């Protein structure tokens, strides 16, 4: 769906499957290898909860700037471990992590990093931030019905410990 929406998907990472292709895109063994070969700056995690913390930290170490963790059920202690790990980076180096248990990020008419139904969004000037994917979709659809568009919609996730708070995302909207 991200490719259909126009997002610039450059490859994937699956340890042990480097050198293969999926959806006609290269697959790499590590995020570092993917970044080196593609210049990727964003990542999306579609991994089992037990591997999510290591995947997020690997993305940060590889220089990924924005990461979306779609996966739900990441143990709270793993999210705490990720947040502590991220303290090693300066503010300008720190990866932005959205999720877990989220729908992702969409800027209508531009790009999507997630699993949102792109057809319900109209391009515009209103920002949406939601813990619930479904409520975010409903807000976007109601705005569209009123002919009001969305600049960006961010689903920060419904798990107890998130990578980004409402305050963090409002700060990004203000930048």
Spell out what each predicted region is.
Residues 1-175:
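Catalytic-core regions of core metabolic enzymes
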């Amino acid at each position: 769906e991200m490719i259909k929406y126009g997002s610039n998907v450059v490859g994937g990472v699956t340890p042990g499957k480097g050198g293969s292709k999926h959806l006609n895109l290269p697959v790499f063994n590590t995020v570092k290898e993917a970044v080196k070969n593609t210049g990727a700056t964003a990542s999306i995690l579609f991994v089992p909860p037990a591997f999510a913390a290591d995947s997020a930290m690997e993305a940060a170490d590889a220089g990924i700037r924005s990461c979306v963790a779609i996966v739900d059920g990441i143990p709270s202690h793993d999210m705490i471990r990720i947040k502590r790990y991220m303290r090693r980076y300066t503010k300008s180096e720190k990866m932005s992590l959205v999720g877990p248990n989220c729908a992702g990020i969409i800027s209508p008419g531009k790009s999507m990093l997630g699993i949102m139904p792109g057809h319900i969004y109209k391009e515009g000037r209103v920002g949406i931030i939601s813990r619930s994917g479904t409520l975010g979709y409903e807000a976007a659809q109601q705005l569209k019905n009123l002919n009001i568009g969305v600049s960006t919609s961010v689903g920060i996730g419904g798990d107890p410990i998130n990578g980004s708070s409402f305050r963090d995302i409002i700060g990004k909207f203000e930048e």
